[in-house]
Amino acid sequence: MTEISVKLPHEPYNIQVTVSSQEQVQDVRQSIVELPGTFQYTSFHLEHNGTRINDYIELSEVKDIQANSEVVLVEDPYTEKEARMHVIRIRELIGAAGDRVDNLHGICAGLSLHDSVAAGEQLTDTKEGERGVVRDHALVDYDMTAPPVLQTILPRAQPSLPKTVKAISLSPWNPPPYHLRQRGHLLYLQVTTNEGEQHQITSHVSGFFVNKSSNAKFDPFPRPAPKNYSAHSLLTLISMLSPSFDASFKALQESNNKKDLLTTFPFQNSIPKNPWLVPPTSSAVTAHQSDITRSQENCLIFGVDNSETLRDWNEEFQSTRELPRETVQDKVSRERLTSKLFADYNDAAARGAVLVAKGEIAPLNPTEGKDAQIFVYNNIFFSFGADGVGTFASEGGDEAARVAVGKDVVGAKAVNQLDIPGLFTPGTVVVDYLGKRLVGQSIVPGIFKQREPGEHQIDYGGVEGKEVVAEHKDFVPVFEKLSASLRVKKHPVWDKEGKRHDLEGSVETKGLLGTDGRKYVLDLYRITPLDVAWSEDAEGHEPYPHRMSVLRLELVELYWRYKMGQYVKAEVQKRKTAKREAEKTKAVEAQNEDKAELLSTSDPGEGENKAVASEQERVDISAFKLALNPDVFSGQVPQTDEEKEEWAQDEKEVRSACDHLISKVIPELIQDLHDGDVGFPMDGESLTQLLHKRGINVRYLGKLAKLSQAKGQRLLALTALLIQEMVSRSFKHIANRYLRYLPSPFTASCVSHLLNCFLGAEVNSNPRPEIDEELREIYPEGDFSFEKVTPTSLKGDIEKQIKIRFRFNLEPKWTSSLKHLQLLRDISIKLGLQIGAREFAFERSQIKSQEHSPEPSSTHSSQDERGKRKKKKGSNSDSPSRVAASPRPVVTFVPEDILNIVPLVKDASPRSALAEEALEAGRISIMQNQKEIGQELILESLSLHEQIYGILHPEVAKLYHQLSMLYYQTDEKEAAVELARKAVIVTERTMGVDSADTILSYLNLSLFEHASGNTHTALIYIRHALELWKIIYGSHHPDSITTMNNAAVMLQHLKKYPDSRKWFEASLTVCEGLFGRQSINTATILFQLAQALALDQDSKAAVNRMRDAYNIFLNELGPNDRNTKEAESWLEQLTQNAVSIAKHAKDIQARRLRRTNLSPRMTIGTKPQPQVGQNAPATTNGATSKSIGLDSRSIDELLKFIEGGGESRSPRSKQKKRAAASNPKLRGSKQSTVQTA
């Protein structure tokens, strides 16, 4: 990194910019635009030595440029587009831009709560005028058994920002007439200053000036002196016009600087996460403000004719793929463009899909049935994920079509990731919205072309189902590469006439030669074989909804690795056998030789043996071949005996892969969760991620639940989570069925009624839907079947769906064990609901707090619009819609609670291979103790991630999380805290303020803050994480044992011994519930609790707890185990002199906690959570100071035990032969922590 000097045309006239020689000049431009002294510049170029610098070259390519070189910023004339962008930017800079309302980004999209949490803002209600009690520490009043506080995930009300201008908008005189456009007029603006003066401004190619127009008179030419204000930047012009502007703008900047930049940074390469729970319409946070420019923004962004939105997406995708990839910089530029292009396309496709779903776009084939209609909008081709033309009639109709398009986007993502030269895919996005599934694809040239008679529409693969099969020699090489990467076997298929065709891929995977000469691969929903184990296990079960149940790509890869491992073992065994035979032969020959000769050859013989051993370590796997035939079990009929034999072999291999899933992968996952070897999932999303990573399809939730139940108490939490996920998924399918053909104005009524029948059945066992009959009359073809749903029918429907989809039978009283809030959250996420926050009554006992259901809080709600219309069905004449004095019937949800529904987007964006390679290389270097090289590579990976993805992206959030862990392990705590803080904010904004990843990020941040000496801040983060945990899971999550222990240790560090003791006791309660009273895990916590009790001067209880720990260790591990001996030693000492020991324990604790870079190892055998004392072995070795009256050896060993020292690891971890504490497994590795695999 070097500095260059930038000479400016205005104050401050010169700035220093830190740059990298690998950066493009446009990145340097962006850096200048974002600096406080230069952000008014938008239309400019840079010059060096009087020569203009091209924006699209690397800085290193600029002639004679070096460190401290001077670059000159030269203002350019504006174009109309640049003028519009300048106005938008200045509006945002001066705080004049209101919230945008669009179809894609919902309420509070991309929300971050970090700044509010870090400031320690309390959520407890305090009456107006009362001051909140100053807390000693964040956990002082925390109740672990209290119900969750919904305000935890809501944005806090912020103080109003300083106002810089009253309004800035397009003038009523805009756009300029033709004759003035030719004279350089671009836009006409209207600015009202804080002083109340209104100014008409002309945007000219040369800059901005105040004109002589008024609201009634058009005169867009400059005012005469002395009021002839003009400037190149609108920001500068406004500061000339408004005396108060500079002061208010400075105050606005100071206010913005208090926030972390990442919390307000705009999204560029990803779609922001929409929270499921949002403030109600009455909240100041979401109040709708008057803003004339909001309706003008589309014009400002896209221009008057909207032509800038019309992009040739397909050509952009394919030409980007064809960019050079020889050098590293080529690859960076290519991947960066690819990432941006996919982000833009996903955004455009999602917006278009929403318009199609709402009926805003006219179909190309209006005479066809609704499901068969196709649409083109913004150069994107849209169709419904339904079987409108009978393509999937034999596979399951609409259900099969819905699954197929979902699998297609996964397949497209896999092909995009492989990035095979010469093979192209159309841009593909699947959007679920209002019960409909829509597919958006870029238009492949020639796909709509009418072919000559006798020519097929498709050039390679099945043309009309499987009856006609096309072949094309040009597709063989690229499909061969694709199939090799996806482990797909070249195999024969037969058309309807029995003719054989040898295909590289599935008959369902099609190749199309576009009119642009490129080879496209389409329909990638069958790149893996059918799951024959699932389809053949249908006996005794309801018929599955479709025949599209295929294996996951992850499973195929795992199976390939498993078989390769077997192959390597077999090869090694062969070599060992061959070596033994050779040795025998040599021994026989040696008997006939002279002893001296034997001695003379002994040394070379040893060298030879070493060479053989070395050779054994290297097994050539090029001879290993494993590929699966994706078309077996799908109706293909081999013709000859040879073909039948080959087909039978293919079927056998696929059965073997399916069996691997059933008999090995699934049981191993259950065992790993039982043993605590993987992070325990917290909600449906994290559970699904874990299953998919292991190659397990979601349809196996029922099987997993049965295996989990068989494991008993230890996996009770997992069983409940699996059942909850089955229930929420079944509800999603049912809701989608009712929403699919329902007119959109009734969506809120439908959703609220279904939720009342499901989650509010105890409050009202016979809820009635609220429907405006007059509005209903104008939709005679709408499907209003949801009206007939009752709690009983819905319960039966859910049970039926679970039987069909997951082959699992719920217990008769399953509804009594539901976690209502968690289910509401899961359902909302799966359907894209945004619900207005309030206290929902799920049980009769909660009704007391609300005598009747809440009335709409918004003054512009539906009943005001239709107050005089017919009464709603199910409501009497005293309905609050008509007579405000009377309550509605008591129900849990009302239509006004459903504030919005957002589209759910599945995209095919590939990850950056270059950034991942750099990260992996860095990890390996650090593991090999090459710290400097490793850190350099990791920083390079971070730079690549940020360049390619932009800062706000889930992949960048994961990297920040991983890097923070790596820096913590290498004892660079400040860097670890900074990266962990970034990880929290980016995770909140891209994955959700209450996602499982967000909780992990907050917990890690708390550990790093504590290690850096900021224990009070650490406790604030722990409190927030625990509140989030309550919302997404409830209490007593298996991982919470570790967090509670960490909190207890932090409180000990603050010398809050009574509070610390409470947290150890809470941890013990959860541990006993999960692992039983007599488990080693419980004994480990009892040991720590005894310490805490001694510190709290409760000597009697300390002795009792230590005795309990000793007895468990003795029974479970025997008298000779180190843990038993330590517990016995401490028990004796505590018993001999309890008071004295308490005093000495205090001294020990003081010495231990002064070393803030460590804390107890808290995994206690439950799960691989990031441990506070990760580098404890290195730091505890020096703790040799002796304590009076205690055996120093015992004390040091105890320190190692409770801090996670290497010798005193958790007993069960010894039995499991796990890695030493210096290389611990990290919690959440399934999602977002360091993985070295």
UniProtKB/Swiss-Prot annotation:
Instruction: Tell me the compartments it is located in.
Output: Cytoplasm
Q: Which SUPFAM superfamilies match?
A: Hypothetical protein c14orf129, hspc210, TPR-like
What are its GO biological-process terms? intracellular distribution of mitochondria; mitochondrion organization
Under Gene3D superfamilies, the record lists: Tetratricopeptide repeat domain
The protein's name: Clustered mitochondria protein homolog
Q: Which InterPro entries match?
A: CLU-central, CLU_dom, CLU_N, CLU_prot, GSKIP_dom_sf, TPR-like_helical_dom_sf, TPR_rpt
Q: Keywords for this entry?
A: Cytoplasm, Repeat, TPR repeat
Record note on quaternary structure? May associate with the eukaryotic translation initiation factor 3 (eIF-3) complex.
Gene of origin?
A: CLU1
What's one Pfam family here? TPR_12
A GO cellular-component term linked to this record: cytoplasm
